């Protein structure tokens, strides 16, 4: 949330040399345009929100394809967003098969693809994107440590599995 206040840009003094004394520089970010997001099956709500929140803050419309096995978190997030003051058409949550997601990569109207998942799939998607900007988060390793003196290993395993696939 804190980073969203810096999206519009900043004004900086350019006093790094005597020649620049009294000069200021300004940079401004502008929305990239419509974005496409493909989120993974693990941490389905959290990793979807990591894509959606910056797009909303920057004013970029988006389409989100949640993982086929865990779409509920993204669907519920879409229902919540539908009750906000976001403009109609600002977002779409589109659960679909991998084959049905080709437009997420090849449609030139979508200016950015953000994908979280396996390296093989990610690099394949990037190769199909043409001039579109691509953000890849590949091959995560969310390690879990279980102490050797854990009293109930079956309970620990059950909680780890629940936490991994929680919706």
Where are these regions (language model features)?
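Glycine-rich phosphate-binding loop at the start of an alpha helix
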Residues: 29, 46-49, 68-71, 75, ...
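Hydrophobic packing residues within well-ordered alpha-helices of enzyme cores
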Residues: 1, 74-77, 104, 125
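PLP-dependent aminotransferase-like
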Residues: 48-102
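Phosphate/diphosphate-binding loops
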Residues: 115
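Short coil/turn connectors at secondary-structure junctions
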Residues: 29-34, 58-60, 87-89, 108-111, ...
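Structural signal for hydrophobic packing residues in well-ordered secondary-structure cores
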Residues: 1-12, 81, 85, 108, ...
């Amino acid at each position: 949330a804190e980073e969203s206040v810096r999206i519009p840009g900043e004004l900086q003094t350019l006093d790094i040399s005597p020649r620049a004394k009294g000069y200021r520089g300004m940079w401004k970010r502008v929305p990239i345009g419509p974005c496409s997001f493909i989120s993974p099956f693990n941490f389905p709500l959290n990793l979807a929100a990591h894509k959606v929140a910056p797009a909303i803050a920057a004013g970029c419309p988006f389409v989100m394809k949640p993982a086929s096995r865990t779409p509920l978190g993204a669907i519920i997030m879409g229902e919540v967003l539908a009750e906000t003051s976001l403009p109609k058409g600002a977002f779409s949550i589109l659960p679909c098969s991998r084959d049905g997601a080709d437009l997420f990569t090849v449609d030139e109207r979508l200016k950015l693809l953000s994908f979280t998942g396996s390296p093989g799939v990610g690099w394949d998607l990037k190769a199909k994107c043409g001039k579109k900007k691509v953000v890849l988060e590949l091959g995560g390793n969310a390690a879990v440590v279980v102490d050797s003196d854990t009293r109930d290993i079956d309970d620990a395993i059950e909680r780890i599995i629940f936490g991994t696939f929680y919706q």
